[in-house]
Amino acid sequence: MAERLDKPLAWLHGEIKTPPFSKEARIEAGVLLRRIQQGESLALPYSRPMASIGKRCHELGVTDKEHEWRIVYRVDVDAIVIGDVFEKKTKKTPRK
């Protein structure tokens, strides 16, 4: 049986911007990203498609003590591309 390899995480801008997540939020983000890397297709309440941004683009929600964080990512054939990480401050996600 062939071993399935996890898709690597690739940062769109070549850098890792670490928001001030609590330890619990870092663990939650890590677990959810690992599941995506392993090929799992997450749905609400964890992730939702962002067709307005592009094909295969999604928004991953991470709840912290006093903040709602979003990780915008795209599922490519060979990698999971992280486009942005930001604090959610409004009901609507900005298109940028």
Set out the residue ranges of the language-model regions.
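Basic, Lys/Arg-enriched alpha-helical interface segments
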Residues: 1-68, 77-80, 87-96
